[in-house]
Structures are given as structure tokens and as C-alpha cells.
């Protein structure tokens, strides 16, 4: 087998592993972004813990078919880049959506969230969700509210009794 074919097979395996393991995968068309804009986007994604790579569409199609995500193939036309996140489902959608608002050249095409194909509208909806940390902080504040209210009520009663006794 030739060296080129072996290298392509390794890339297909790499893409297939990333598609299989990632919680969130977003396909974007980066045509029209300047080098500085692309660098800024990569930096923002890296800070969010998201891997951003450009692969040949033909290799990505083979990888998608091998992990039974062939429905992704219809979005693999033109120059594409793929953002993978193994930890946070929301992070790639949020970073890419925010960047696309400021840079019209970046076009979100589709994504795969936990193995399910999602459209542009669904990616935008996911981008508006708070991150995992944000959701946990909301949950904690909801859980703390009754205790805080009880403590404040008890304190108010104690202060009222002090005023009446003084």
C-alpha cells in the first residue's frame, strides 16, 4: 500500500475517532475569513477547550460513514472546518455563533450533538444555553434560596423581639 493511502487512512481514523468521542461537533464554512480573523477564532475556540481543524471533505465523508453519521455528508461541500468538543456541549456552538455574529464570512452549516445531527437553527438555540458551570450555579442559587429566606426571616423575628424588649 502506498504511503499516501496509509496517511489518508490514518486521517480518516482520526476524524472517525473525534466524531465518535466528541460530545459536540460543529461544521462551518470559513471562506472569506482573513488570516487574522481565523487566528482569532482558533484562539477563542482553544480557550473554550474546543479543537478546530480543517479536513478534506472526502476524508471527512468516509469517517462520517464509518461511524454511521452519513447524514452529515450533505453539509460537507466547499471549504469546511470542524470544531470538536469532548467536554462541553455548548462551548463550540456558543463561540462559533458569537464569532459569526461579528464576522458574516463565517457560516455555521450543521453539527452533531451527542451523536444526533442538528441544523443551523438548533446550533443557534444551543448557543443561547448557559454553560454547564452556569447551569450548576443557577441550580445552587435555587437550592440556597429557601435556606437564605429562612435565615433572613429568623433574623428579622429576632431583631423585632429585641426592639420590643428594649
UniProtKB/Swiss-Prot annotation:
Record bears the keyword RNA-binding: yes
Entry-linked InterPro entries: Ribosomal_uL10 (IPR001790), Ribosomal_uL10-like_sf (IPR043141), Ribosomal_uL10_bac (IPR022973), Ribosomal_uL10_bac_type (IPR047865), Ribosomal_uL10_CS_bac (IPR002363)
CDD domains for this protein: Ribosomal_L10 (cd05797)
GO molecular function, one term: large ribosomal subunit rRNA binding
Cysteines paired by S-S bonds: none
PROSITE patterns to which the protein is assigned, alphabetical: RIBOSOMAL_L10
One GO term describing the cellular component: large ribosomal subunit
Entry keyword Ribosomal protein: yes
Keywords per UniProt: Ribonucleoprotein, Ribosomal protein, RNA-binding, rRNA-binding
NCBIfam families: PRK00099.1-1 (NF000955)
Subunit text: Part of the ribosomal stalk of the 50S ribosomal subunit. The N-terminus interacts with L11 and the large rRNA to form the base of the stalk. The C-terminus forms an elongated spine to which L12 dimers bind in a sequential fashion forming a multimeric L10(L12)X complex.
Family the UniProt entry places it in: Belongs to the universal ribosomal protein uL10 family.
Protein name, as recorded: Large ribosomal subunit protein uL10
Annotated source species: Bacillus cytotoxicus (strain DSM 22905 / CIP 110041 / 391-98 / NVH 391-98)
